[in-house]
Amino acid sequence: MRRHSPDALRGLVESYLGELAFAPELGALEEVLRYPLESGGKRIRPVLCLAVGEAVGAEAEQCLPAAAALELVHTFSLVHDDLPALDDDDERRGRPSAHVAFGEGVALLAGDALLAEAFRLALSYPSTAAARELAQATLGMIGGQYRDVTGDTSDLAALHRLKTGCLFAASVGLALSVAEVAEREQAPWRAFGAELGLLFQIVDDVLDGDGYSERHGAEAARALADEAAARAQGRLEAIPADTSVLAEIVAGLASRTA
């Protein structure tokens, strides 16, 4: 079976999202949904989903609806996070945030619609397993955001396992669901998925100078990121499959500069 490179997988995701048909009931709101989707995100979560899918024997195209659903949930979270009631950010990826470009009420509705569209995609499979996986991840992400908003940051690892880690874990879990991997064979894959969110978040904090970096210092935070990357690579080495593309993705997560 063909294995795509991370860049090729990202190209598949971009094409799929660009051609994705939203519900006609949304009318002109579709423009607002596409605005944050087309703002140049890295697509790390859907690329991971496709790479895991290929590693367990599925075709990348088979996993595209699930991968796109992940990106829609992630984008929904960004649109809502930027609102004045939460992070109050006026800019996202070098452009005005959705609430600045279209108004708070419209941005709120766009986020709601992105979430609904994500579940429409997840429910396009014969089994409901993908939708259940996505629901659990979304609830975890929201729970982590609640901790952040209410200032419950005493346990950063627990917060980030929810806020960031749940969608990364779902990148793996959704691929396993779509490929119908037997539950008894899922444990090493899920152990790998559990490492990814923390790795991503620590590197994020090093780049932004907050979170782990602010609490422990930049050098110590960088060491934590290296340890997280080593754990993720170790999890991959324990999996009896061709995980070379995933190893490349993990290395990219650990060394990213933006």
Segments the model singles out, each with a brief description of its role:
Residues 1-258:
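All-alpha prenyltransferase/terpene-synthase fold signal
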